[in-house]
Amino acid sequence: MDFVQHALLTASRGALTMSLNSSLSYRKELSNLTATEGGEGGAVSEFIAIIIITVLVCLGNLVIVVTLYKKSYLLTLSNKFVFSLTLSNFLLSVLVLPFVVTSSIRREWIFGVVWCNFSALLYLLISSASMLTLGVIAIDRYYAVLYPMVYPMKITGNRAVMALVYIWLHSLIGCLPPLFGWSSVEFDEFKWMCVAAWHQEPGYTIFWQIWCALFPFLIMLVCYGFIFRVARVKARKVHCGTVVTVEEDSQRSGRKNSSTSTSSSGSRRNALQGVVYSANQCKALITILVVIGAFMVTWGPYMVVITSEALWGKNCVSPTLETWATWLSFTSAICHPLIYGLWNKTVRKELLGMCFGDRYYRESFVQRQRTSRLFSISNRITDLGLSPHLTALMAGGQSLGHSSSTGDTGFSYSQDSGTDVMLLEDGTSEDNPPQHCTCPPKRRSSVTFEDEVEQIKEAAKNSLLHVKAEVHKSLDSYAASLAKAIEAEAKINLFGEEALPGVLFTARTVPGAGFGGRRGSRTLVNQRLQLQSIKEGNVLAAEQR
């Protein structure tokens, strides 16, 4: 019986050893087959592909980093997240991708174990930080579009710095476990780089995907979903407003022209407005789909590959699919400067100005040095493809072409910096009655939002100082009166009523004011009674002693 059990155990061990050896030999054969498949043409095509990816990642992110760094007014709070995103992608192209290029040529890792672990950590860290930064940018745009008036209070400089620090700490927590025993780091001959051994610890693979990929992806879906819903609602409101305006204009013009021509022109304008707003709505939808679609296309295949490896083993994925899924994740670093950098009108025009010299600057940037907190808000809104009309309504103002009829505040827009810069200005319904004109409104103010805030702060500071001065003056007066009262009481206690000046017992009456005279006499009597009671109390106290 023992002999049979020993034989079965030996056979099972032998089968396991054979399966492991066959697995290793199978992967080796696949590697050799992949290397020899297509001859030198396949190796050359892979080399050219990874070289192109590396160059595009490096140049694209470097251009955005330099543009934002040189033009300080562009480095708003929102663009600080973009700056961090592109800078991390640039570091990926410098510290990781060159070694991937070398490994794709040599078909092995030649840089040692230490650098293998370090490059794997860098790849995971930068990739995780990039995905989390996309989620933070979505939150920033959410507040800019849905709550533009409280955006400067919600998204502050300190909170932006704290968000960036949190992004990197969050990413570091998700990337350190392979260096401390939960999973491990290995050179993957089909990814041509050192990565975490996703097939060894399925638990870590699922943890990293949820912690660093699924979490920001859900944030993006929720935030951009709310943004698009608000854009649709505001577009309907603007469209209804234009219909009312057209009808009123038609009624006015009907008094001068025939009703037939008026109705036809009104219907044409109404149709034109509907086309414009539907186009803006489609542009916003396209922008959101591009942002989310780029994330899914670049990172989706890689997530599917590592999930398959974690659940069904290393050999379940085709080597070619594994290679291209990994390299497709590198292309996300190409999409980021395009979507979050060049998609921005202001950044794009500044970049063209840097490339084509001062002539382009003079034509496009007359007031490019003006800075504003609401410049950042408008950037976030217009980057989503929303029209100035929608931007005005989302900020709580009126559509362009309408003046405020309720009016504490109104909004006008300027294209000075290549985007819709929002300017806050005052208006009243009495001085500015509502007018419906088809011509574009004139710019009524060039005062920036920060200037308005500074003026309000100065006025509040002056009023606060005035109130403090009045309070101190009242306190000083009260203290002086209290001191005189204490002094009078002390004199009464020591010297009696005769020591006090006679003016205290003289009632001030105003001639012709009978009520004031009677009130003064009653006050005098009350004072005498109080002094008499005090004096009698002092005498009784002396007799008792």
UniProtKB/Swiss-Prot annotation:
Which Gene Ontology CC terms are recorded? ciliary membrane; cilium; glial cell projection; neuron projection; recycling endosome
Q: Which GO terms describe its biological process?
A: adenylate cyclase-activating G protein-coupled receptor signaling pathway; negative regulation of smoothened signaling pathway involved in dorsal/ventral neural tube patterning
Q: Which residues are glycosylated?
A: 21, 32, 117
Disrupted-gene phenotype: Embryonic lethality by 10.5 dpc caused by increased Shh signaling and ventralization throughout the developing neural tube. Defects in Gli3 processing.
Q: Could you tell me the membrane topology recorded for this protein?
A: Multi-pass membrane protein
Write the record's keywords in alphabetical order, separated by commas.
Cataract, Cell membrane, Cell projection, Cilium, Developmental protein, Disulfide bond, G-protein coupled receptor, Glycoprotein, Membrane, Receptor, Transducer, Transmembrane, Transmembrane helix
| Name of a matching Pfam family | 7tm_1
Residue spans, topological domain Extracellular: 1-46, 102-117, 181-205, 307-322
Q: List the disulfide bonds.
A: 116-194
Molecular function GO terms recorded: G protein-coupled receptor activity
Cytoplasmic topology ranges: 68-80, 140-159, 227-285, 344-545
Q: Where in the cell is it found?
A: Cell projection, Cilium membrane; Cell membrane
Q: What is the effect of changing residue 251 to A?
A: In mut3; does not affect localization to primary cilia
Segments passing through the bilayer: 47-67, 81-101, 118-139, 160-180, 206-226, 286-306, 323-343
The record, for PANTHER family, names: G PROTEIN-COUPLED RECEPTOR, G-PROTEIN COUPLED RECEPTOR 161
Function summary: Key negative regulator of Shh signaling, which promotes the processing of GLI3 into GLI3R during neural tube development. Recruited by TULP3 and the IFT-A complex to primary cilia and acts as a regulator of the PKA-dependent basal repression machinery in Shh signaling by increasing cAMP levels, leading to promote the PKA-dependent processing of GLI3 into GLI3R and repress the Shh signaling. In presence of SHH, it is removed from primary cilia and is internalized into recycling endosomes, preventing its activity and allowing activation of the Shh signaling. Its ligand is unknown.
Disease (UniProt): An intragenic deletion in Gpr161 is responsible for the vacuolated lens (vl) phenotype that is characterized by neural tube defects and congenital cataracts. The vl mutation aroses spontaneously. About half of vl/vl embryos display lumbar-sacral spina bifida and die before birth, and the other half have closed neural tubes but show thinning of the midline neuroepithelium and epidermis, dilation of the dorsal ventricle, and presence of ectopic neuroepithelial cells in the ventricle. All surviving adults display congenital cataracts. It is not a null mutant allele.
| Similarity comment text for this entry | Belongs to the G-protein coupled receptor 1 family.
Identification of the protein by name: G-protein coupled receptor 161
Which species does this protein come from?
Answer: Mus musculus (Mouse)
Lineage at the top is: Eukaryota, Metazoa, Chordata, Craniata, Vertebrata
Q: Which gene encodes it?
A: Gpr161
